[in-house]
Amino acid sequence: MKIQEKMRKPMLEARYLNVENTDRYRPIIRLFYLKYEKLKYWMYQEDVFEELKEDPYFQEYTMEQCQQDLAALASWGNLLTIQDTRKVTTIEEFKNKKFRYQLSETAVEVERMVIRIENLLIEGSSLEPTLLERLRISLGRPVSYTHLTLPTN
């Protein structure tokens, strides 16, 4: 087997999966992925921030943290950026560089792989460690039984 140059280099796009702030990076990438699936490719920092703030885990999350997280993900190649100059009316606004962000194609494929791994079914007879976590999450969701009808015997 001939080992190509790119196989010996680290894959920076997968870095967000196993670093200090992965608890913030993974939801951001998942948000972009879900929007990507709905054909909404570009997002502003404010959109990302507001979506994350809807989750109780992100109640203490700040706009500065969001900006730093997006910058880190962009530096690893997960997000593509473009400066948005459509709404700029002053030189000061132009200098503040408001960006739009898009998930890179590599990040799309990494996130698809992550989702497949998260949804793996039990193949063997042993209890999968993530099964308990998935059960806990599923049991935490409210269940509606209004659509069920009882048998009349």
Give residue ranges: language-model regions:
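Short alpha-helical segments that sit at the start of domains
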Residues: 3-39
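Short acidic, hydrophobic short linear motifs in intrinsically disordered regions
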Residues: 39-52
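Short helix-coil junctions and helix-kink-helix linkers
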Residues: 50-61
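Short amphipathic alpha-helical interaction segments
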Residues: 60-75
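A short, conserved structural fragment
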Residues: 74-85
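Leucine-rich, amphipathic alpha-helical/linker segments
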Residues: 107-145
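Conserved small/polar residues in nucleotide/adenosyl-binding loops
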Residues: 146-153
